[in-house]
Amino acid sequence: MTSLLALSPLILVCATAIVVMLTIAWRRHHELTATLTVVGLNLALAAQVVAWWQAPVSVTPLMTVDGLAVFGGVLILIATLACATLGHAYLEGAQGPREEYYLLLLCAAAGGLALVSSRHLAALFFGLELLSMPLYGMLAYTYRERGALEAGIKYMVLSAAASAFLLFGMALLYSRTGHLDFAGLGEALATAGGDGWLMAGMGMMLIGLGFKLSIVPFHLWTPDVYEGSPAPAATFLASASKVAVLLVLLRLLQSSPVQDAWLHSLLAVLAFVTMLVGNLLALTQNDLKRLLGYSSIAHFGYLLVALVVNDGLAAETAALYLVTYVLTTLGAFGVVTLLSSPYSGADASQLHHYRGLFWRRPYLTAVLTVMMLSLAGIPFTAGFIGKFYIVAVGVEASRWWLVGGVVAGSAIGLYYYLRVMVTLFLPEPGMQRRDATTDWAQRAGGVVVLGLAALVVVLGVYPAPMIDWVRFMVAG
């Protein structure tokens, strides 16, 4: 009974997916399908409280529900709820089937919940594939648009290659240690010394997970996929998907710490290069979705700093940064979603689509401005708190060159974030683009982005509740 209660959020999401599938087979109705999805996700989010009271509990040898799993589950469900709500506004004017989007979204969310609870390589692979496969369909959902079809196929092919690296790395680890559980791997790695096959296995696993996190040099797919995919699907890929992978990587490194100096140094170099490459490549972008893609690369470079340090504050720092990143990313992509719709061609992602937005959509302009400031790490926004923690753990560990990389990357990023903000307030152009819904503020999507903007500001001014909650969850 305890195990069932601990897994109740995952069970509810899976049950909702089944109900939605049966509903689609019975009767196609966009409003009904979206409502069932949102109700099921809200029930799953409420069930996280029940799961927390049961934690920590081992659910079979494959999964464990502890504070970190509940924390990741909350973030994934919040991001999925936002994507479902924003997707409703986005798909309202779409031609053809719309209901399957919610089914794919629920299946991907179930994969994310399974992934953050995994403590075994088999569960890790199962959760990762359950998360990735629905994304193939979501990214190519508006298949009449050439860019969406290209994004879906590109992500599918490269993701399959990354999964092959991941599987081969798992095979090498199992052949040398006889263990697939994280704890057993940790003990074997601690006593193995500098075994080359073990390090090769860990390295190949890092390649597979690094692809999912867009770590340099496995990042080249990111801007193309973000640009071509439908805005709600890109939102999920940039938020919930990366949260799940980052948290399972954190759990893996905590259970199976990297002892060899060269592999530890490799992680540090990857963090440094990812920070700088992501920010430098974003400087020349004129497409907001591509810009946010490169920005995402840079932010996961910052997050790698916490994983490299891997001291007492590493988990807390990574979790805190994930909260600020998810809120900000959902808000930024939410504005893109509300200004886009399949009935007016490709998404409103070019910067010239946002020229003079202040004069016709002042509230959306305010939201996007807040999100850009938070991504840049400006004080009085949630993004500043996350970046402060990253710098603090780097200083505490005397990783001065990584701290320098964070500071330099943030300085470079400030330029292109300000460039977006300036565009919003330029004189209005003669040609206006058709937006998704005219009375957006009366709809749930507008409420979502306004609520996210308010949270980003409030948590930036008064971060104590967020810090206490993260510390409580990670410690539990």
UniProtKB/Swiss-Prot annotation:
Keywords: Cell inner membrane, Cell membrane, Membrane, NAD, Quinone, Translocase, Transmembrane, Transmembrane helix, Transport, Ubiquinone. It comes from Chromohalobacter salexigens (strain ATCC BAA-138 / DSM 3043 / CIP 106854 / NCIMB 13768 / 1H11). This is NADH-quinone oxidoreductase subunit N. It is a multi-pass membrane protein. GO terms for cellular component: plasma membrane. Belongs to the complex I subunit 2 family. One of its GO terms (molecular function) is NADH:ubiquinone reductase (non-electrogenic) activity. The chain crosses the membrane at residues 4-24, 32-52, 67-87, 100-117, 121-141, 155-175, 198-218, 230-250, 263-283, 291-311, 319-339, 366-386, 406-426, 447-467. It is an enzyme of class 7 (translocase). It catalyses: a quinone + NADH + 5 H(+)(in) = a quinol + NAD(+) + 4 H(+)(out). One of its GO terms (biological process) is ATP synthesis coupled electron transport. NCBIfam families: NDH_I_N, PRK05777.1-1. Its EC number is 7.1.1.-. It is found in: Cell inner membrane. NDH-1 shuttles electrons from NADH, via FMN and iron-sulfur (Fe-S) centers, to quinones in the respiratory chain. The immediate electron acceptor for the enzyme in this species is believed to be ubiquinone. Couples the redox reaction to proton translocation (for every two electrons transferred, four hydrogen ions are translocated across the cytoplasmic membrane), and thus conserves the redox energy in a proton gradient.
